[in-house]
Amino acid sequence: MKYEMIREIFNQCSNNQMRDVFVSEVDTEDPELVLMNYIKTKEEIIDKTIHPDGTVIFNVVCSGLRQRYSFTPDD
């Protein structure tokens, strides 16, 4: 299955609310396997949300940085 993956890295600096955003297309049956290429352990996953439209969102803290990975099915 193809997904649009959006990786957001939140800036922790005060007065700078911009975040780094990376968009890519991935082909996988399990978005969590793709996520594990970016993080070290499953313990870094804070929560996982599955929306009715099939979108899977992971909130993680990796190396002290808060990140969000969104996988939206590409119909």
For the regions a language model picked out, list residue spans one by one:
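N-terminal acidic leader/helix
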Residues: 2-32
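Hydrophobic alpha-helical membrane-spanning segments
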Residues: 5, 30-35, 67-75
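Short, surface-exposed beta-edge/turn micro-motifs
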Residues: 1-2, 55
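Short, mixed-charge low-complexity intrinsically disordered segments
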Residues: 41-75
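A short, charged, amphipathic alpha-helix used as a generic interaction element across diverse proteins
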Residues: 29-47
